[in-house]
Amino acid sequence: MSWQTYVDDHLMCEIEGNYLTSAAIIGQDGSIWAQSASFPQFKPEEITAIMNDFSEPGTLAPTGLYLGGTKYMVIQGEAGAVIRGKKGPGGVTVKKTNQALIIGIYDEP
């Protein structure tokens, strides 16, 4: 299975009436492994800031998490493993793996 198939079939699928609005798997170096058509174009420094927060949890809290130019307020996650951000009725969740970041963006139902 390709990473694109994983994004399309497993991240963008409906689960109990809920679904992500966009998703991606991005290498820790910022390279795109796979993404949904609606995933925002991000800046390399946005991924660098996310990686820095995984290394030093709390660094994004004062400035917010930016992805595709959109600012999310950082909310409680799991230090070194998951970062969560909130913007209005939606948000973003970033999960760090050994080699990549799995990112899901959602709107509240």
Swiss-Prot record:
Spans traversing the lipid bilayer: none
Database matches in SUPFAM superfamilies: Profilin (actin-binding protein)
Pfam families associated with the record: Profilin
InterPro entries: PFN, PFN_euk, PFN_sf, Profilin_CS
Organism: Actinidia deliciosa (Kiwi)
CDD domains: PROF (cd00148)
Superkingdom, taxonomy of origin: Eukaryota
Summary of subunit composition and partner proteins: Multimer. Occurs in many kinds of cells as a complex with monomeric actin in a 1:1 ratio.
Major site of localization recorded for this protein: cytoplasm
Protein family membership: Belongs to the profilin family.
Swiss-Prot/TrEMBL keywords: Actin-binding, Allergen, Cytoplasm, Cytoskeleton, Disulfide bond
Protein name: Profilin
Compartment list: Cytoplasm, Cytoskeleton
Functional note: Binds to actin and affects the structure of the cytoskeleton. At high concentrations, profilin prevents the polymerization of actin, whereas it enhances it at low concentrations. By binding to PIP2, it inhibits the formation of IP3 and DG.
GO MF annotation list: actin monomer binding
Disulfide bond in keyword set: yes
GO cellular component, one term: cytoskeleton
